[in-house]
Amino acid sequence: MRTRTLIPFGAAIGLLASASAVVVSQARTPYLLVLNKDDATLALVDLKTNAVAGRVGTGEGPHEITVSSDGAMAFVGNYGGQTPGSTISVIDLAARKEIRRVDLGALRRPHGLAFADGKLYFTAEVNRAVARYDPATGQIDWLLGTGQATTHMILVNKDASRMFTANIGGDSVSVIERGASPLAWNVTVVPVGKGPEGIDISPDGKEVWTAHSRDGGVSIIDVAARKVTQTIDLQTKRSNRLKFTPDGKLVLISDVDTGDVVVVDVAGRREAKRVHVGKSPEGILIAPDGGRAYVAVSGDNNVAIIDLKTLAIAGRISTGIDPDGMAYVER
């Protein structure tokens, strides 16, 4: 025979209220993290309201930012100004404060950043190198030279077994792959166009695209073959960043000199549209749901919001002076 336990009405209401409280407590707020180079600050933008919810000071000339896998910490490369920078700011996002400024010693101009497998990978432009910082020990525990001038941006896969760097001065992309042991690495230098800077990997992991800042082209690299299979002439004046949409259908490229974001149809390998966003667009971040792109318009001191369905500007956010690098986090 089945037995049933009857819960008094008042207790049932209490249980429902408790369940609702749990749901509310688990609700997370999306934030856009924006670096303001001239202000030397990180602005935290609440994307529910598009208002700046807080600011944190960084080192001089913060250019790029990434976030730990758990969303607790942000890491900022302090590129410097006339004097090359040599520090990385570690920021507690809950407390909204810098908790450590990592001294990189002889490594200069930290730039591209990526967090993978519990560690921070970054480029050191002056040193033509990629290095790794372990937050658990507070130490730089790995360093690899690329042999290429101005190693600028970096992409790293989830287990940190493969990475790609855009080498502006070397007119190349370095494909860096772990060998038979964690200490063995293989580097393939892939020649591309003039001044590769913006770089991203397709969502399916099969292609790396890099935009040339000095000849208006985009090189498409077959990851498996480690070679360029196609070059698209987009006639950009000075491309800066390149990002895929999450569905892999579009690529967005910022053109600093024209003030445009060039939208590329990936399947057709052709320009689909140009969206004029303002003076000197630089960093690009695309929301994980693929609905919007955020473009740091450094010359106008704002972040333009592009609706990726209509490919029209949907708003602007004032974050500080000379915005550039951005990251996304939910807390």
Spell out what each predicted region is:
Residues 4, 10-331:
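Predominantly soluble domains enriched in secretory-pathway, periplasmic, or organellar proteins
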